[in-house]
Amino acid sequence: MTLSGKPAALLVGTLKHAHKEWEALGKYAELKTYSDGTREDFLAKCKTEFQNVKAICRTYNSKFYMGIFDKEIIDNLPPSVKFICHLGAGYETVDVAACTARGIQVSHVPKAVDDATADVGIFLMLGALRGFNQGIFELHKNNWNANCKPSHDPEGKTLGILGLGGIGKTMAKRARAFDMKIVYHNRTPLPEEEAEGAEFVSFDDLLAKSDVLSLNLPLNAHTRHIIGKPEFQKMKRGIVIVNTARGAVMDEAALVEALDEGIVYSAGLDVFEEEPKIHPGLLENEKVILLPHLGTNSLETQYKMECAVLMNVKNGIVNDSLPNLVPEQRGDIE
């Protein structure tokens, strides 16, 4: 406990919108912030002014000045830390295994991102199918409709979704408006009433049947490079790839090769394997639509995410438990 008799909550990084909600947490906890600095400085403060911190709210932007929450960081957190609340749906920048070993619960923000990320997925799918990026390239070169070949409509195509979670379900719901057939693959099939009209198929059938493949699964040890050269060889020639998940679920070099060979017709990508670095073969390909990780970059969604993560912090402080535990700590992933 602090001198005030309250446990402390530490914000690592910055909030853009939910400042009043953060201040309101002061009713339950002494509020501390770490909005810039270095990894070494943070580790030093863990031995001094962060000693009474019970819950940490970690934003994605903190990785740019102090790195990820890896085993080194986790092992040096004060013994008082019981909860880490990550601001984001993807949480690969937190070493969950190290947290579990120390008895630290980890939460993420899964539902608040669903609509915005699915919207970006639909945008990328339509743009890649219709070849819009080539038209954009030509206009920037002051060429009107030059070299723009006929493209493809979404109607009647099969959309394959790898990872029918919240974002995948929302993607399926939106895609139905385009009269697409929807198939999906999860490690475990969903009850029919939860699948948004999508048909469960095996992983190999997903690759073989899809005209468009949307990647909507988290990045972990099981999913890293789940799409690579062997998987591209099993796909329909002329498939469209959409990735709004994490770049490293797909082998970027293998994607470039598949594009060059004509296996992949086009791709729409919001995430990359080594952000902010992008494979030159993607940058040079006019048929590929690239966005700089804008999936949740809307005012409304950012506010929802920040409110959700602060609610997780409040639950940790007040109720001594976290909602929205990451799947590994719920036992969903071994």
UniProtKB/Swiss-Prot annotation:
<feature type="binding site">
    <location>
        <begin position="166"/>
        <end position="167"/>
    </location>
    <ligand>
        <name>NAD(+)</name>
    </ligand>
</feature>
<dbReference type="GO" id="GO:0051287">
    <property type="term" value="F:NAD binding"/>
</dbReference>
<feature type="active site">
    <location>
        <position position="246"/>
    </location>
</feature>
<dbReference type="InterPro" id="IPR036291">
    <property type="entry name" value="NAD(P)-bd_dom_sf"/>
</dbReference>
<dbReference type="GO" id="GO:0030267">
    <property type="term" value="F:glyoxylate reductase (NADPH) activity"/>
</dbReference>
<dbReference type="Pfam" id="PF00389">
    <property type="entry name" value="2-Hacid_dh"/>
</dbReference>
<comment type="similarity">
    <text>Belongs to the D-isomer specific 2-hydroxyacid dehydrogenase family.</text>
</comment>
<feature type="active site">
    <location>
        <position position="275"/>
    </location>
</feature>
<keyword id="KW-0520">NAD</keyword>
<dbReference type="GO" id="GO:0009436">
    <property type="term" value="P:glyoxylate catabolic process"/>
</dbReference>
<dbReference type="GO" id="GO:0005829">
    <property type="term" value="C:cytosol"/>
</dbReference>
<dbReference type="GO" id="GO:0005634">
    <property type="term" value="C:nucleus"/>
</dbReference>
<dbReference type="InterPro" id="IPR029752">
    <property type="entry name" value="D-isomer_DH_CS1"/>
</dbReference>
<feature type="binding site">
    <location>
        <position position="270"/>
    </location>
    <ligand>
        <name>NAD(+)</name>
    </ligand>
</feature>
<keyword id="KW-0560">Oxidoreductase</keyword>
<feature type="binding site">
    <location>
        <begin position="293"/>
        <end position="296"/>
    </location>
    <ligand>
        <name>NAD(+)</name>
    </ligand>
</feature>
<dbReference type="InterPro" id="IPR029753">
    <property type="entry name" value="D-isomer_DH_CS"/>
</dbReference>
<dbReference type="GO" id="GO:0006091">
    <property type="term" value="P:generation of precursor metabolites and energy"/>
</dbReference>
<dbReference type="InterPro" id="IPR006140">
    <property type="entry name" value="D-isomer_DH_NAD-bd"/>
</dbReference>
<feature type="active site" description="Proton donor">
    <location>
        <position position="293"/>
    </location>
</feature>
<dbReference type="InterPro" id="IPR006139">
    <property type="entry name" value="D-isomer_2_OHA_DH_cat_dom"/>
</dbReference>
<dbReference type="InterPro" id="IPR050223">
    <property type="entry name" value="D-isomer_2-hydroxyacid_DH"/>
</dbReference>
<dbReference type="GO" id="GO:0016618">
    <property type="term" value="F:hydroxypyruvate reductase [NAD(P)H] activity"/>
</dbReference>
<feature type="binding site">
    <location>
        <begin position="244"/>
        <end position="246"/>
    </location>
    <ligand>
        <name>NAD(+)</name>
    </ligand>
</feature>
<dbReference type="Pfam" id="PF02826">
    <property type="entry name" value="2-Hacid_dh_C"/>
</dbReference>
<protein>
    <recommendedName>
        <fullName>Putative 2-hydroxyacid dehydrogenase UNK4.10</fullName>
        <ecNumber>1.-.-.-</ecNumber>
    </recommendedName>
</protein>
